[in-house]
Amino acid sequence: MSSAVLVTLLPDPSSSFREDAPRPPVPGEEGETPPCQPSVGKVQSTKPMPVSSNARRNEDGLGEPEGRASPDSPLTRWTKSLHSLLGDQDGAYLFRTFLEREKCVDTLDFWFACNGFRQMNLKDTKTLRVAKAIYKRYIENNSVVSKQLKPATKTYIRDGIKKQQIGSVMFDQAQTEIQAVMEENAYQVFLTSDIYLEYVRSGGENTAYMSNGGLGSLKVLCGYLPTLNEEEEWTCADLKCKLSPTVVGLSSKTLRATASVRSTETAENGFRSFKRSEPVNPYHVGSGYVFAPATSANDSELSSDALTDDSMSMTDSSVDGIPPYRMGSKKQLQREMHRSVKANGQVSLPHFPRTHRLPKEMTPVEPAAFAAELISRLEKLKLELESRHSLEERLQQIREDEEKEGSEQALSSRDGAPVQHPLALLPSGSYEEDPQTILDDHLSRVLKTPGCQSPGVGRYSPRSRSPDHHHHHHQQCHALLPTGGKLPPEAACPLLGGKSFLTKQTTKHVHHHYIHHHAVPKTKEEIEAEATQRVRCLCPGGTDYYCYSKCKSHSKPPEPLPGEQFCGSRGGTLPKRNTKGTEPGLALPAREGGMSSAAGAPQLPGEEGDRSQDVWQWMLESERQSKSKPHSTQSIRKSYPLESARAPPGERVSRHHLLGASGHPRSAARAHPFTQDPAMPPLTPPNTLAQLEEACRRLAEVSKPQKQRCCVASQQRDRNHPATGQAGPTSFSNPSLASEDHKEPKRLASVHALQASELIVTYFFCGEEIPYRRMLKAQSLTLGHFKEQLSKKGNYRYYFKKASDEFACGAVFEEIWDDETVLPMYEGRILGKVERID
């Protein structure tokens, strides 16, 4: 159906009256406009002739009242209702022009088509065809009218057409819905549109706007000036039409109503294209179209037109002509403001050209220069990536080599094969320990054997490795030595034989062992001598290096040669004891790695196997004797360590080497064949679980009363008597225990000496097998102070051991619950148990 449906004549006055029907024509002028002649499939209406001004003035039926220059003008009636607008010929044409610009003219055409269909004769055969045409044109497809109609209304019309039940009111519901939509949206926008404002400003009397397309030729000329190029001169040709008195004024309502049109026309006339798909002029880059936030634009309008106490005059009871009962509250005003903000939405602002220059990065350059710069940057990036990749590959290769060497060292040490690399004595990460770890190992060793003295070989460093490690360590020492049992002069510093063999781990351990285990005040001369010796070790004169590790000895040869001095200790350190140990004329046994008087060269430690047998025999004897005499060793051996502590270093070393490791004289060095043979398999490592059980058993026996005491000589002779008949690959304990026999009495003596000022507190916590031990500077301790020492807070029961004759064991555990009670002491210390309350 054609969209050229225009205003039709109103129904005959004799027809049924409808509230939404337009006003009847002026009496006497009914015949000036011919009636509508609908055609088949098309609702046509002849365009009415212009009504004269006299008829327009008298169309209210009352004539011109006396005393008035003119009645209400059509422009005033257009603002009253949509019917008044559509009832006027010029108003309907102007409204249609507005809807065409908004691309929703189908709503107006559908409204006029419904009016024309209502006037048709139902008996005419054309009526059914017109109804079908209206349904197909506006309702069946997905048009603007179809989107605004309710589904029930569309269903009702479709059913009526299918059943051919045609009625004059079948489109009334659809017309009412479309009319409501136009009244709420299009009609309100039309009253503030530029077309309507232009027509109002001209007074509706200028007929130039009706020629050559009528009102559609109106054009809004307000806005920014077009962009002017630097080499051009601006002329006023573009503003000729703006000089006419018909230009819309720059009022707030006018600007707000014409904002969208002005922005569109400015974009079309400017250099920048309105469509994003088209290229952008460089002059306007970065100055795209912006939309002012709805809140800022509307708040600005609201604040400028706000009816506040400052902006309203208070001359009489009415405020600016507004009755006080219609003012409303602040909440109502705010509600209206927010409703206006939601209705208006975003206000599009016109394009504002900027004259700033483009940034340097966006300045167009020559393709060749751009390509050269891009290539240089890409090559630089490629070099960086390649260098980083190669560095990562090298690091990965180093890690793989280290892992491979570590696995080879572990396999070679397990199979007993000789290791050619000098650093085989120092596996990766073997000595990287912090002081806290060494201190923890020291305390755990003290707690494991509090009542047993270990067979010692003199001064030693605290144990920090497992037994199997020390065993393999000794085996490697034997395997790396020459067959003749002699060392070249270059072996004076075994672990620092070459500068290339000085690793970070070795240096770290040397520093740690030297500081923490030999921290005795030294003179300036001793420090210089040690530095000179260290330089000689780092710069050897020969090319063949042999590794030799004296794991327990700190003595020096009687006549050292220049640059020929042993670097003792487990980790290859330079102990201070070497500088002031024994006297030059003192001869050391072969077991201690001393110098032979006849050969004048360092000898092999030939009694490593004998030492292992001593350790194994000591474990068997101590296990057998601890059942009956667990405390005899602890209380009897006090004189020897005190005496040895007061003796000068030379006498201490002499006594130790003359008596041997077990405390009695040694006549000859006993050698075992498997010790000297590097092809023999290593001994089986001890069971860790068995060692822990043995330590727990000894700790449990500490609390038993002392029953028997004997002399030092007989006790040591019973425990340390060697079993020479046993020779074979048997399991033995950690070799570091062999040196505890010499140091345990010394430690116990110092503990008893400090009891006058310090208090030893030992307790078992919640059934744990290993107890906790603390030293407190106090003469006595209460339960409250004891609770403060616990790191874990909670509800516990506290039991403390005290001497008692009630039982045969001679002691009981007494429960104490009062915080002010002084805790009992047992054998000079506090021994308690903390149990959790279930």
Curated annotation (Swiss-Prot):
Keywords: ADP-ribosylation, Cytoplasm, Developmental protein, Phosphoprotein, Ubl conjugation, Wnt signaling pathway. ADP-ribosylated by tankyrase TNKS and TNKS2. Poly-ADP-ribosylated protein is recognized by RNF146, followed by ubiquitination and subsequent activation of the Wnt signaling pathway. One of its GO terms (biological process) is regulation of centromeric sister chromatid cohesion. Residues 756-838 form the DIX domain. Residues 42-55, 727-737 have a biased composition (Polar residues). Expressed in lung and thymus. GO terms for cellular component: beta-catenin destruction complex; centrosome; cytoplasm; nucleus; plasma membrane; protein-containing complex. It holds the Pfam family Axin_b-cat_bind. Coiled coil: none annotated. A motif (Tankyrase-binding motif) lies at residues 21-30. Residues 303-318 have a biased composition (Low complexity). The keyword Ubl conjugation applies. InterPro entries: Axin-like, Axin_b-cat-bd, Axin_TNKS-bd, DIX, DIX_dom_sf, RGS, RGS_sf, RGS_subdom1/3. The keyword Metal-binding does not apply. Residues 413-476 are annotated as: Interaction with beta-catenin. It comes from the Eukaryota. Residues 81-200 form the RGS domain. It is found in: Cytoplasm. Its main location: cytoplasm. Residues 56-69 have a biased composition (Basic and acidic residues). GO terms for molecular function: beta-catenin binding; enzyme binding; I-SMAD binding; molecular adaptor activity; protein kinase binding; ubiquitin protein ligase binding. Residues 327-413 are annotated as: Interaction with GSK3B. Inhibitor of the Wnt signaling pathway. Down-regulates beta-catenin. Probably facilitate the phosphorylation of beta-catenin and APC by GSK3B. Interacts with SMAD7 and RNF111. Interacts with ANKRD6. Interacts with glycogen synthase kinase-3 beta (GSK3B) and beta-catenin. The interaction between axin and beta-catenin occurs via the armadillo repeats contained in beta-catenin. Interacts with SIAH1. Interacts with SIAH2. The tankyrase-binding motif (also named TBD) is required for interaction with tankyrase TNKS and TNKS2. This is Axin-2. It comes from Rattus norvegicus.
